[in-house]
Structure formats: C-alpha cells, structure tokens
Amino acid sequence: MPEVIARTGRVQSWIDDPTSRLPVSCTVFVVEDSMEGPEGIEASWRFVSHALRYGAGCAVHLSKIRGRGHENGKGLTASGPISFGKIYSTLNETLRRGGIYKNGAVVLHMDLDHPDVLEFINTPRHELPWVKRCVNLTHEMWEDSTHKEELLEGIKRGDIWLNKIRYDPYGNRIYGNVCLEVYLPSRGTCLLQHVNLGACELEDIPAAFYKGMSELCKLHSRTGVGDTGEYLPSKTDRQVGLGMLGLANLLRRYKVTYKDFGLTLEDYINGGHGYSKAYLIVQALAQGIRDAAKVATANNMVRAFAIAPTASCSYRSVDLEGYTCTPEIAPPIARTVDRDSDTFGVQTYEYGDVEIASEVGWDDYKRVADGIMTLLSRTGLAHGYSFNSWSDIVTYNEEFIEQWLDSPQTSLYYSLQVMGNVQDKSDAYAALDEAEVDDYLNNLFNENDLNCNCQE
C-alpha cells in the first residue's frame, strides 16, 4: 500500500540525521528601519544566511525600511529597501553555489503602499536575479494605489506575486513566507507535511488527516529550532502546515470531474446534502479537516493547514494504482512529466488518465480551490494556498485582482501556461528544494531570465 502521508524532504532528512539541515520548510524576517539592532538590516543578513545554510526558504519583509531619498533629520539619506535587495540576492547565489544542498530560496516582500513599491515592481530581473518579489496588499491599498497598471504588468511578466496582508486574532500582523502558503511572525518557522489523497480510499481520508496532523504536532515539539538563537522557540511559535496532494488522482479513481467536485463543494458549503461519489469525497475531506483541526487545537496550534506547492513530494508519492501523484490540488498541465536531474538523468513520471488543466478550465479549477480553502478557513486554523493563475486563460486586469481579493484565496503565486505544448507545472515551479534538480537549475540560470523559488 502506498503511503497516505507525504513527508517533505526536509522532514525526512532531519528524521534520518538530526544533525543535518533543520526540518522546517520556511521562515520569515521582518526588517526594522535600522542598520543595527537584533531586528535590523545587518541582523537580517545573518538570519538569511542561517536559513539558507540549514535548508529553509526565507521571506524578507522590507516595508519598514524608509524609502529612497528619505532624510532622517540627522544628515543621513536613506538608500531605500531595493538597494539592500541586491545583498539578499547575492547571499542566495553564493550560499547555493557553495552549500551542500544547493536549494536556497529567498523572496522579498513589500507592501503596496510603500513609497518605493514602483521601483520594487519595475526593477529588472537581472538586478535581483536570485530572489523573487511579492507585493502585499489589502482591499484599501488596492483601491488607493496609483500603480495598478504597473502591478498588473509585473504579474503578467511573472516578476511579481501577490499576498494578502493578514493579522492574527490578537491584532498582530503575520507575514507571508517564500511560497506564500504560510503566515508567520518574524523569525517564526513552519513544518510542512501533506496528505496523499491519491493513496486513500474514501474511508481512509479522515484517518489520513488525523495521522498527518498528529505527526506534525508531535514533531513540532522535538525540532529544537529555537536553540539556534535565530528562530522563535517552539513553545511560543505555534504553527504547523498540513496540506494535500494527489487530488486529481483521487478524482480519477472515483470518476469524478473537477467540475462536479467543485459544484458539490459549493453546495456542501451552502448546507446541501447528497449521496453521489462527489458528495462522498467532499464529506470525507471535510471530516478529515475537522478531525485534524481537533488535533491541532489540542496541541495549541494557532495555524495548522497550508496547501504548499508539492512537486518534489509528488514525485516520491504514488496512488493506489501505482501512478505518480499530482502536485497539490490543481489539475496538472500534462499527464506525463519528464524530470531531468543531475543525479538520476531523465525520469518520466505518469499521472495516469487524470483530468488536465486545459480540460478542466479556469472557472472549475477556481471553484474547487475556493471550496477547499473555505473548508480550511472555517477551522480558524488556515494559513493559505500557493494559488497559481493560468496566464494563457485569465485576463490580468483590475476586475481579476478585485475578484481575487474577494475570494478565500490568500496568494497569487506563479502565472502558468496550461494550454497546448508548454512546460510542465513542476518545471515552472523551478523546484529548488531537491539537489536532484541541479541540471534543470544550471540550464535555467544560464538564461537571461532567472527564476528562483522554493517548493516541495
């Protein structure tokens, strides 16, 4: 029987060798407007170095740094946060090339109302080649922004991601991570793990969620990440991230389309009932989420669900019929993917006769994604979802952003092409979390447009 729990490579490596890289997948640093001090600019360089050397993707939030040209009244003029962005890019480049795992990822975040946000959006890729950029926003920031056109163009180019600004129940801001599926306090970390839906019969789904959350909560207390002096201690940093992969495999096995599943999710959320295969899947999924939420609450977790980009994990996961499981909850771009790696050469992975994105269509996929996020959000323990848009289907305009802001989605991640003969989704992720993809990365970094990202 295939495993119903898909561990991240980081977690498995740590279990095998606790002296190796740390098991946490991601961390966040919010830079204060000062060169010195424990949360200042210089401290952020050390923090990023530590995160990369020990295998965690690092999001650096720059919005507290004064804009370029701002005078502090003491004769000093600020150079602005983008000038420091080049240092983070160089750190990632240098540490990746010299490190053991060669899997670093850094994302720079800036709020839409920062005075330098236009420079942040328009900075050419070659000036920040080893980092990605994300703009954080609220409804109000979007309405007041004078840079909507430039932001939309940045999204179209694939240079800019979006993340909604969020606060915890006590009014403290929490910050998006590298892949935008997790929200953390500064110096917080998160363990990730995924339920392999493709390995589940319907009756197995609730138990799989219970098992996955139980394992995460047990591991959370053992990691010792706070002992490093860089990360928050686990006693106060209370979150994990249980996600899922292989949804397309599960739907194929029970002959349920994304359209039917999405409509059923919508009906269930609105109080409907039924006995179709789609309804049985929805009910099992909802029960699993509720059971996992009880485990997280019993362990004093403040956030516990996160749907991460899981391409690398999916390659190591199979469904009940022996096919490779598809990443996260989206339909794949193709039924077959070739992965070219330095270690294993070209490997071909077959997803079986699953629905693919061009067959599903944007509206039906989004209905599924919104429905699952609604189920997670109702627990009060949801982080978010690394939600991709389909650039050859959707139109990036003001209406699109406003619909996204009104949706249960928390991020707008990669802009992927899904129609016809285009690259596989997992390649578009530029899977930096596994040493086996060095060949792909070497080819990528020899091109003019560099694409650095963390995913598992």
Residue ranges and their predicted role:
Residues 1-456:
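Long, C-terminal-biased catalytic regions of enzyme "large/alpha" subunits
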